[in-house]
Amino acid sequence: MNRIWLRAIILTASSALLAGCQFGGLNSLPLPGTAGHGEGAYSVTVEMADVATLPQNSPVMVDDVTVGSVAGIVAVQRPDGSFYAAVKLDLDKNVLLPANAVAKVSQTSLLGSLHVELAPPTDRPPTGRLVDGSRITEANTDRFPTTEEVFSALGVVVNKGNVGALEEIIDETHQAVAGRQAQFVNLVPRLAELTAGLNRQVHDIIDALDGLNRVSAILARDKDNLGRALDTLPDAVRVLNQNRDHIVDAFAALKRLTMVTSHVLAETKVDFGEDLKDLYSIVKALNDDRKDFVTSLQLLLTFPFPNFGIKQAVRGDYLNVFTTFDLTLRRIGETFFTTAYFDPNMAHMDEILNPPDFLIGELANLSGQAADPFKIPPGTASGQ
């Protein structure tokens, strides 16, 4: 009875021990002589979306030189449920690569053997350095097409790529050339001439393409406005269609106006030319007296008074006027009853009135005197 219990215990322990062990074949064990296992070797992990048929112990190469080996491949699940392969690489101690190095699964031979290729990045500057425990993210990994994928794509092209049409193209080309060798011989120099002409105008063609590019950029920036314009275009066309009779009438009226204008110009062109000739003398006179004409324009704002008198009378925003009214009977009688123009014995109005000095010069108190006011000595006119 004791032997039975002892056998059961031994069998249970053996089963538990064997259940905790796993053996994946000889390739799951580190093979002797592979790189990346010597003194100073270190390990890095590469995240790859697709490793194809990459096995463990595959070589790791830098510039076609083996510097390590694949130590293991583990499938890791992302939070969204997708998977990626975490490839552990053992590298020799003399491998110096930046931390942002790129890793690719490459084809070693046409027989299907694969290896992992490590290299510095080419699209950005290298940073940092790979050390033990570093990780190369999935963004820095890639895979070259395998031999099977290349032959599969080639089979698709051959079978379903319409390669058979190539025979028809060759046959049609032969029929076009057969019997017309002379024309095609002359065609070659013409093509050479055309090519030379295009070569001479290559800068103009480039400028035209640049201009087209700028126009395209402008249209791209205003695509919203163009879209709105195209949306409103049907309504505009509809309005034009509704008013097409009025538009036709307007153009017909414009035609009649053009005919009348043409007739008037034809009948009056001689007179119009003579008028222009006669206008030359007027324009010439204005040009000759342009300085005096411009100076005379100053009098328009103060007519009939000269501007220098206005400047003396007007100070600021106010006009100072001093007026003396003589309403005596003697002055009224002399003014209204003794100034008949046709009576030579009566004094005239210009002999009685004395305008201000600042308006017409020193003429005050010069009644009846035949003298030039500008030649009278100062003080004489005012009675001094």
Swiss-Prot record:
It is found in: Cell membrane. The keyword Signal applies. The keyword Oxidoreductase does not apply. It comes from the Bacteria. Keywords: Cell membrane, Lipoprotein, Membrane, Palmitate, Signal, Virulence. GO terms for cellular component: peptidoglycan-based cell wall; plasma membrane. Lipidated upon expression in E.coli. Residues 1-20 form the signal peptide. InterPro entries: Mce, Mce/MlaD, MlaD_Phospholipid_Transporter. GO terms for biological process: intermembrane phospholipid transfer; symbiont entry into host. It is a lipid-anchor. A lipid is attached at residue 21 (S-diacylglycerol cysteine). A lipid is attached at residue 21 (N-palmitoyl cysteine). Coiled coil: none annotated. One of its GO terms (molecular function) is phospholipid transfer activity. Stimulates the host (mouse) immune response; lipidated protein produced in E.coli stimulates T-cell proliferation in mice previously sensitized with LprN. Spleenocytes from these mice produce increased amounts of TNF-alpha and IFN-gamma, as well as somewhat increased nitric oxide levels, upon subsequent challenge with LprN. Previously sensitized mice infected with M.tuberculosis have an exacerbated disease response, suggesting this lipoprotein may down-regulate the host's immune response. NCBIfam families: Mtu_fam_mce (TIGR00996). PANTHER family: INTERMEMBRANE PHOSPHOLIPID TRANSPORT SYSTEM BINDING PROTEIN MLAD-RELATED, LIPOPROTEIN LPRN. This is Lipoprotein LprN. The gene is lprN.
